[in-house]
């Protein structure tokens, strides 16, 4: 049966995902940046309260995946922290200036991760040569690759995802970006074994007093009074679709 991973941005969201049938959580901070390394406090609380597998993302900033020496040093420290806290896996990825996997740096990450299952995230979708990259990741011992098939969403990239799945000795290919209940059957019918979804919605803040003339964001038009949360009903719906597909 296909595995359902839910992207979560808080302990509360991780618990919601767990309670509604998620098989695994990718734990992140900063949804508007596409996911950054969670704080130590969030990592510890999730480790304490969430019982399904949780893989934190290790990503020090938004933007590209070519990092300075200082940023890479932080990545290695965060990998060691996640390992010491007892998480079963993590999510990360590093490219060089030419859009290839930065093999020397990824080798250091894999050494620091030790027995943890490492997912190479959507840095894969920004690489120059996906098939060569897939071979490099297999050589590194990467457990899985999260990808939209190098398109803006995974449904558009499904043909590339199927090509990657067919690649000899490839890691597990997990489809992500725009995967929802309404299109999930396309991925299941194509033989995708793992799917990744935010299954989320914007939730209004409980704040009654609101200073509408001030923003804490560099975007003056950003909504300070909403947050992105996992929709438990959406998770349950996706899990049900997977189970019914398996029963066919």
Swiss-Prot record:
Subunit composition and interactions: Homodimer.
Q: NCBIfam families under this entry? A: PRK11572.1
* HAMAP family in the cross-refs: CutC
What's in the GO CC field? cytoplasm
Q: Write down the InterPro entries for this protein, in alphabetical order.
A: CutC-like (IPR005627), CutC-like_dom_sf (IPR036822)
Q: Which domain of life is it from?
A: Bacteria
Sequence similarity:
Belongs to the CutC family.
Its name, as the record gives it, is PF03932 family protein CutC
Q: Which UniProt keywords apply?
A: Cytoplasm
Q: Could you tell me which Pfam families the record lists for this protein?
A: CutC (PF03932)
Where is the protein found, in the record's own terms? Cytoplasm
Q: Which organism is it from?
A: Shigella boydii serotype 18 (strain CDC 3083-94 / BS512)
Q: Name one GO molecular function term.
A: copper ion binding
């Amino acid at each position: 049966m296909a595995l359902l991973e839910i992207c979560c941005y808080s302990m509360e969201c991780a618990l919601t995902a767990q309670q509604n049938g998620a098989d695994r959580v990718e734990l992140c901070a900063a949804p508007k940046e596409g996911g950054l390394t969670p704080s130590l406090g969030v990592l510890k609380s999730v480790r304490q309260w969430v019982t399904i597998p949780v893989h934190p993302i290790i990503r020090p900033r938004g933007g590209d995946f070519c990092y300075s020496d200082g940023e890479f040093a932080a990545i290695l420290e965060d990998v060691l922290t996640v390992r010491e806290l007892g998480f079963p896996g993590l999510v990360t990825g590093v490219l060089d200036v030419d859009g290839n996997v930065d093999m020397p740096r990824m080798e250091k990450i894999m050494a620091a991760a030790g027995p943890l299952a490492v997912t190479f995230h959507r840095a894969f979708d920004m690489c120059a040569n996906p098939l060569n990259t897939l071979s490099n990741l297999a050589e590194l011992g990467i457990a899985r690759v999260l990808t939209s098939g190098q398109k803006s969403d995974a449904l558009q990239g499904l043909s590339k995802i199927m090509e990657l799945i067919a690649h000899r000795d490839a890691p597990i290919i997990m489809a992500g970006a725009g995967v929802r209940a309404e299109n999930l059957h396309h991925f299941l019918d194509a033989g995708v074994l793992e799917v990744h979804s935010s299954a989320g919605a914007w939730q209004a803040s409980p704040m009654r007093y609101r200073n509408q003339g001030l923003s804490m964001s560099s975007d003056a038009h950003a909504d300070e009074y909403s947050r992105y949360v996992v929709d438990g009903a959406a998770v349950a719906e996706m899990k049900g679709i997977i189970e019914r597909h398996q029963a066919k």
